[in-house]
């Protein structure tokens, strides 16, 4: 094929190529924005930590409603924990209730809370919440078994 007998211009093919390039650019820009927004807002890349934050919210809502047996089941990721309480004899329900009421850092019932942000590490997702407007609570949701665990460090926003 020489320059003098070039193929005819196909407008439909060119429009399709243009639309694919434009759509790919828009998709790429949206992914970059979502990725950075999730990270900067403290919810993980592409908001991947939102399920863990939701779990923490369900747990704290249950504690706020003073349904401690249900909260204990959420804490251990075992809704049927009452059928085998001997598995949890190292941290019994009574101690759990004390830890989330009188012996807690906020010294009483949970009256309000806000799940602030989260960070992912090798073993799970660490979620920070504010209890009763002033006190920080940091729990880790373990990847291995889905249980909640006390996290010894204060989680702060930042890079």
Model-predicted segments: where are they?
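Short, low-complexity N-terminal intrinsically disordered segments enriched in polar/charged residues
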Residues: 5-61, 65
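Short beta-strand edge/turn micro-motifs at domain boundaries
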Residues: 2, 12-14, 21, 130-159
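Short, structured coil/loop segments at alpha-helix boundaries
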Residues: 18, 51-56, 74-77, 146-149
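Polar low-complexity intrinsically disordered regions enriched in Ser/Thr and small residues
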Residues: 26-28, 111, 127, 136, ...
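Short, flexible coil/linker elements and helix-boundary hinge sites characteristic
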Residues: 42-44, 84, 101, 133, ...
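Contiguous hydrophobic segments
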Residues: 2-12, 18-23, 92-107
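Short solvent-exposed beta->alpha transition segments
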Residues: 54, 58, 69-126, 130-131
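Hydrophobic, Leu/Ile/Phe/Ala-enriched alpha-helical segments that form helix-helix packing faces
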Residues: 63, 100, 104, 147-150
